[in-house]
Regions:
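Metal-dependent de-N-acetylase/amidase catalytic core
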Residues: 1-7, 78-229
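Active-site rim/loop-helix segments in enzyme catalytic domains that contact anionic ligands
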Residues: 1-94, 215, 227
Length: 229
């Protein structure tokens, strides 16, 4: 049983948008998993073998308790009934308390489809009188992380302080050499420079060194305002 399940369209999306959150939860003793929906291949400089090795290296840095790939088609991901059932079965098996999915507005069709799929599968996972294996389960909440392909100003519901975890987040992202280093321009600002600037911006917003924005479709409750940074 997992406390947190981060669902990613491709291997590297969870690292880009939620690695700081993952590392913080792990540091607090939570059981955290990642489900990649597709292999992420083909890409210009990647291969299935290379991407799998990169994912394994990033997984080790994050210290994940569980990671699997659902094996859905890259570049043509759709929230079909078959895909919904497959994801709902996983949710009934690993029984996460909270889900993390990509932000719902994106230029990448796979990302948009992934979010629609997560929301539908979350509902299906609680169904009774079904031929799906496993006992019914309904994750309490969905948070949305930003790994978008749009130049837009994010409007998060909260920003998590990831200052102690930034360097490890960057190390996990660097594992995907075929995606973020190979074939990329080396003149500043590099892609990784831009990621650092973005995290620093969100850190500044909350008075910290680095931050990770998260969105929610539903209101968030606090036990006490003392929990605010």
């Amino acid at each position: 049983m997992l406390d947190i399940l981060v669902i990613a369209p491709h291997p590297d999306d969870a690292e880009l948008g939620a690695a700081g959150t993952i590392l913080r939860f792990k540091d607090e003793g939570a059981r955290v998993g990642v489900l990649d929906l597709t292999s992420g291949e083909p890409t210009p400089f990647g291969t299935p073998e290379k991407r799998a090795a990169e994912t394994a290296a990033a997984t080790a840095i994050l210290g994940l308790d569980w990671r699997e790939n659902l094996g859905l088609p890259n570049r043509s991901l759709e929230p079909t009934l078959e895909a919904r059932r497959a994801l709902a079965v996983v949710l009934r098996r690993v029984r996460p308390r909270w889900l993390f999915a990509p932000y719902w507005v994106d230029a990448h069709p796979d990302h948009v489809a992934a979010t629609q799929l997560v929301e539908a599968a979350r509902f299906w996972s609680k169904l009774t009188k079904t031929d799906m294996p496993g006992e019914p389960w309904h994750p309490q909440r969905i948070f949305y992380y930003y790994c978008v392909h749009l130049k837009q100003a994010a409007q998060p519901a909260l920003v998590l302080d990831i200052s102690p975890y930034w360097e490890r987040k960057l190390a996990a992202i660097r594992c995907y050499h075929s995606q973020f280093i190979e074939g990329r321009p080396t003149t500043p600002p590099t892609f990784l420079d831009q990621l650092r600037d973005e995290a620093a911006y969100w850190g500044k917003v909350i008075g910290k060194a680095y931050g990770e924005p998260l969105a929610s479709r539903e209101p968030l409750g606090l036990a006490s305002l003392r929990d605010l940074v």
